[in-house]
C-alpha cells in the first residue's frame, strides 16, 4: 500500500512567548475543490489550539471530542487542561482507531503554567514535542522554508510572519493547498485569530 497523502497543510511554531498555528483554507477531495474557506485550525480551550490536515469528517469529530473532554476536565478540576495532557489524550483517541485509522495528522499548540509547547501527532497517535512542525501535503515545502529561518529566540510577531510566508510558499507549489490563511497566536493571555483571504484571479 502506497503512502497516503493527506490534503491540506497546517504548521506550528513555538517561541519563548507563545505558539503560532497557521493553515491554508482549501478543502479538496479526489481532485475536486470542495471549499475555499475550510477551517483547519480550531481552539479547544482559550489557551490550546489544534491544526489539522486530512479528511474534514475526521477533523470535525476529533474537535468535538477534544472540546468535550477539555470542558469535562475543567469542570472536574477547576482549571484548564494542560497542553501536554490534551496531546496525550488525543494520542489515546487516535490509537484506539488504529485498525481503521483516522485520515488526519494533527498539530497541538498551547500555553499553560509550564509555558508554551507544541506537538505533532500522526494518524495512529504517535506524539512528538517539537519547536516547529508541519503536517499534510505541503509539509515538506513548509519545513523546507521554516528550517533555515527559525530560531527559538523569535518573537511572536516574527514567528507570525514566518508562519504566513511558509504557508504562502506551500500554496504556490501544492495544488491541495490554497485560497487563504488562517492564523492563531496563543500566549499567556489567551489567543488571537487572523484570516488572510486571497482574491481569485483570471
Swiss-Prot record:
Enzyme class: hydrolase
Propiece residue ranges: 1-8
Catalytic residues as annotated in Swiss-Prot or TrEMBL: 9 (nucleophile)
Localization per Swiss-Prot or TrEMBL: Cytoplasm
EC number assigned by the record: 3.4.25.1
GO molecular function: threonine-type endopeptidase activity
Keyword Transcription regulation on entry: no
PROSITE patterns assigned: PROTEASOME_BETA_2
InterPro entries: Ntn_hydrolases_N, Pept_T1A_Psome_bsu_arc, Pept_T1A_subB, Proteasome_sua/b, Proteasome_suB-type
GO biological process, one term: proteasomal protein catabolic process
Keywords annotated in UniProt: Autocatalytic cleavage, Cytoplasm, Hydrolase, Protease, Proteasome, Threonine protease, Zymogen
UniProt note on regulation of activity: The formation of the proteasomal ATPase PAN-20S proteasome complex, via the docking of the C-termini of PAN into the intersubunit pockets in the alpha-rings, triggers opening of the gate for substrate entry. Interconversion between the open-gate and close-gate conformations leads to a dynamic regulation of the 20S proteasome proteolysis activity.
Cellular component aspect of the GO annotation: cytoplasm; proteasome core complex, beta-subunit complex
Reactions mediated catalytically: Cleavage of peptide bonds with very broad specificity
Family designation: Belongs to the peptidase T1B family.
Role summary: Component of the proteasome core, a large protease complex with broad specificity involved in protein degradation.
Stored NCBIfam families: arc_protsome_B
Description of how the protein assembles with itself and partners: The 20S proteasome core is composed of 14 alpha and 14 beta subunits that assemble into four stacked heptameric rings, resulting in a barrel-shaped structure. The two inner rings, each composed of seven catalytic beta subunits, are sandwiched by two outer rings, each composed of seven alpha subunits. The catalytic chamber with the active sites is on the inside of the barrel. Has a gated structure, the ends of the cylinder being occluded by the N-termini of the alpha-subunits. Is capped at one or both ends by the proteasome regulatory ATPase, PAN.
UniProt xrefs under HAMAP family: Proteasome_B_A (MF_02113_A)
UniProt name for this protein: Proteasome subunit beta 1
Protein's organism: Desulfurococcus amylolyticus (strain DSM 18924 / JCM 16383 / VKM B-2413 / 1221n)
